[in-house]
Amino acid sequence: MTDAANPPADISALSFEEALSQLERIVQELESGQAALERSIDIYERGAALKAHCEKKLEAARLKVEKIVLGQGGAVAAEPAEFN
């Protein structure tokens, strides 16, 4: 079983878009019900690793986003954005 916290190297090298595309194809294959049991288990595990990778990429992007605020005296500063 693949540890979602430590995805395989081939997944770690994927961009968000590439990982999401692979994850979408896995979901389609699983939903079709046409895959054999062992294949279903294998691609489910890969899908879990891809999901974790996508979440990690999204979190990294979120942390990069900043909001511009006008401070006292008209000073402009950047602060981490809050998405609550």
UniProtKB/Swiss-Prot annotation:
It is an enzyme of class 3 (hydrolase). One of its GO terms (biological process) is DNA catabolic process. It holds the Pfam family Exonuc_VII_S. GO terms for cellular component: cytosol; exodeoxyribonuclease VII complex. Gene3D superfamilies: Exonuclease VII, small subunit. The keyword Cytoplasm applies. Its EC number is 3.1.11.6. It is found in: Cytoplasm. The keyword Cytoplasm applies. GO terms for molecular function: exodeoxyribonuclease VII activity. Keywords: Cytoplasm, Exonuclease, Hydrolase, Nuclease. It catalyses: Exonucleolytic cleavage in either 5'- to 3'- or 3'- to 5'-direction to yield nucleoside 5'-phosphates. Heterooligomer composed of large and small subunits. Bidirectionally degrades single-stranded DNA into large acid-insoluble oligonucleotides, which are then degraded further into small acid-soluble oligonucleotides. Belongs to the XseB family. NCBIfam families: PRK00977.1-3, xseB. This is Exodeoxyribonuclease 7 small subunit. It comes from Caulobacter vibrioides (strain NA1000 / CB15N) (Caulobacter crescentus).
